[in-house]
């Protein structure tokens, strides 16, 4: 049975809504949800660059051939296979902040100096911007403002969609030509990994957007282009709860095992397959995500966080990109 409504508030009752001295109830913690995971940047070893245009040499061997020489042969000098000279351009990535000196000393939620807190946030943002730069198929430019080539520009291995699709040359000088979008298949991944393996690489990391990662999990069902040799079955006892496996985090190919890393900053419609032994991040000295305090222009504090450098694929044929995906 419903309870009857109480009577109206008596006249003259002092209510909270009319009170003058009520304090705010503002939590003393500032919560942050925006992510800062950067799988490709984190996977790179760091080897300093010394010039804005950083260059490196890649040596390949002559192809294997039938080699049977006569006894007592006279030496004939064979052609030398010269190393290939590659380069990339150091890009400046910066985030700045200005805070009044008054704001630095008043009592703020979180109990921190607001200038220092903002610098920490700018550092996270620079790292995210760097992840976007190294995973994007944007081509380097030496004119100011300089821009690095992303790893996809160095990947001649992999595949493009049909139609006008053309892979990058593989030296960072172009991004290729887009083709018709198509659905991802395991056959595409297997082919790209085999191309890298044939050239001497061993991809161990797959970088992809969240949409591609979610679609990858559906490929374990088999079907055209998605041959499934074996499926893992998780055994449970009566004391354990049954777990439905709806994710694919590792893909084992005939040429190695790939850790699948969803990347919030990786461009859509592509998968980058990375041989982590052959990829470097090359910052200029004292320019590797550093904090800077700028000169005061008044009653305020100004500063920023700066990275200057580029990605350096030391053996481009060890990597691959699958472009033009529907996902």
Segments predicted by a language model, with ranges:
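Flexible, glycine/threonine- and acidic-rich loop/arm segments that mediate assembly and lattice contacts
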Residues: 2-250, 254-327
